[in-house]
Swiss-Prot record:
GO cellular component, one term: mitochondrial outer membrane
Species annotation: Gibberella zeae (strain ATCC MYA-4620 / CBS 123657 / FGSC 9075 / NRRL 31084 / PH-1) (Wheat head blight fungus)
CDD domains xrefs: Fis1 (cd12212)
GO BP, sorted A to Z: autophagy of mitochondrion; mitochondrial fission; peroxisome fission
The keyword Translocase appears for this protein: no
Family per record: Belongs to the FIS1 family.
Protein name: Mitochondrial fission 1 protein
């Protein structure tokens, strides 16, 4: 079992198509009796992908491993956090990451990911406020224009 977790940046570096095809072929070859390590390797390759559908499948496979393989839960927590972070599911990413940090408060990779999640949530929250403010200003301008035109008639 892997004890050292990758940093979040590694999730942003997709495998090349031939590498992902090797993992998929192994996964497909094992069929219904797919091994946990094979499934995990394929799931991680999918999470690293730039394709949203691949990332979603990777998260589903990791969720399956988490449910059926207690010995892999530590790893799965982190990889599920990374996968959900890449998908923009920041609440889920934080939930999985916090479960890992509860068990391992000194885990540098999980701490780093927590900072990335918090930064992304803060940035998107500010963007949301800016968008709502812009919509409010636009509505005010349109309302004032309509009111002004109504008074002229």
């Amino acid at each position: 079992m892997v004890t050292e977790l990758p940093y979040a940046l590694d999730a942003e570096t997709p495998l090349n198509p031939s590498e992902l095809n090797v993992l998929k072929a192994q996964y497909d070859r094992e069929g219904e009796m797919v091994g946990v390590q094979t499934k995990f390797n394929y799931a991680w390759g999918l999470v690293k992908s730039n394709q949203r559908n691949d990332q979603q499948l990777g998260v589903r496979l990791l969720s399956d491993i988490f449910r059926v393989s207690p010995e892999r839960r530590r790893e799965c927590l982190y990889y599920l956090a990374l996968g959900n972070y890449k998908l923009g599911n920041y609440g889920e990413a934080r939930r999985y990451n916090d479960l890992l940090l509860d068990k391992e408060p000194a885990n540098l990779q999980a701490s780093n990911l927590r900072s990335l999640i918090d930064d992304k949530v803060a940035r998107e929250g500010l963007m949301g406020v800016a968008i709502l403010s812009g919509v409010g200003v636009a509505a005010g301008v349109v309302g004032a224009f309509l009111l002004r035109n109504a008074r002229k008639r």
